[in-house]
Design a protein with these regions (language model features):
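Glycine-rich beta-strand-to-loop/alpha-helix junction loops that act as flexible
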Residues: 52-56
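Structured mid-to-C-terminal alpha-helical surface segments
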Residues: 1-50, 62-66, 76-317
Length: 317
């Protein structure tokens, strides 16, 4: 992928796709750079057991940007590694990319046992909204964790959104001249991501971190209707297996009580429709992350989706 090296062509295709699709130019540009780093990771995965996961993986799987998720989340397997080997593997998954320069703003980065966040800068060609409250453009954040359970994973075909929405003629040029197109990357399975998000929503809800809760509420509401998730729900053994991976992971998370917590005791599943603070943060989240009117999910709809989920979870053995 070298489209970004031809600044005129890069800006031109961003503008053309923006005009045809309505997707914001700054999002098309950042998504390209997110995908650039993922392409580099995909080339390492034969030797490096680091797997793409989370909200960005969810929407990359859908080849859409229903809710813009701008960071790269990775789970890094360190089974049978010494402490030194584990640290080096985590660093390789987060700190060693060559496609973009590491940031000089070290306050954006974090390095602790079992978790590293590295940040890579890019120079935006499109106009940046200086009023963007999250200030999320001009860099890509890569977060890798090794206390997580890195399974099950599967190869997933992904591509930059500007390729997804390009015309056939534009796609041919992107592939032939700039090596931009679909590729496969080992990714945590969507069924596992779904299970993770149920627990993540409860984790943040316990702590009244409602803006973070809101993102997971939205994602789970989207995923609940996916054919792949509906098939899992119909297969209780498989659903329990996915939930089990996450419960195992929670035994390794400091301060979490979710490894043994029954679904009947989940605060979130007790109902949140009358939580005014959560409703406010949910609406704020959508203003900042959901940019197409057709992708906006009313809070009351999300409440109903989670009521359906509650009934499903309470019937599990």
């Amino acid at each position: 992928m070298n489209l970004h090296e031809d600044k005129f062509a890069f800006l031109n295709i961003i503008n053309l796709v923006h005009e045809d699709s309505g997707i914001r130019s700054d999002i098309l540009e950042k998504d390209y750079y997110v995908t650039l780093l993922l392409r580099e990771l995909a080339g390492k995965q034969a030797e490096l057991p680091a797997y793409f996961k989370g909200g960005t993986a969810l929407y990359k799987a859908q080849k859409s940007i229903r809710r813009f998720s701008e960071d790269i989340d990775l789970t890094v397997c360190i089974d049978n590694c010494s402490n030194n080997q584990a640290k080096k593997r985590l660093e390789l998954a987060t700190k060693k990319y060559q496609s973009l320069p590491r940031t000089s703003r070290k306050e954006l980065e974090d390095d602790r046992k079992g978790s590293i966040t590295a940040v890579y800068d890019y120079a935006p060609l499109v106009g940046i909204d200086s009023d963007d409250p999250l200030q999320r453009f001009g860099y890509v954040k890569v977060e890798g964790t090794s206390f997580t359970v890195s399974e099950p994973f599967t190869p997933l075909e992904i591509e930059p959104i500007l390729y997804t929405y390009a015309t056939e003629e534009q796609r041919q040029i992107l592939q032939a001249q700039y090596d931009v197109g679909p590729f496969r990357i080992n990714t945590i399975r969507l069924e596992r991501i779904f299970a993770d998000k149920i627990f993540a929503a409860e984790f943040y809800y316990e702590r009244k971190m409602y803006f973070d809760v809101a993102k997971h509420l939205y994602d789970v509401s989207v995923m609940l209707d996916l054919e792949q998730i509906q098939k899992m729900i119909g297969n209780q053994q498989m659903f329990l297996e996915m939930l089990g991976y996450k419960r195992l992971e929670e035994t390794r998370r400091t301060g979490s009580d979710l490894a043994e917590k029954k679904f009947s005791d989940f605060q979130l599943l007790g109902g949140f429709g009358d939580n005014a603070a959560l409703r406010k943060d949910y609406q704020n989240m959508q203003r900042n992350y959901v940019f197409s009117e057709e992708d906006v999910l009313p809070f009351d709809y999300v409440v109903e989706q989670w009521k359906k989920l509650r009934e499903i979870l309470l019937t599990l053995a």
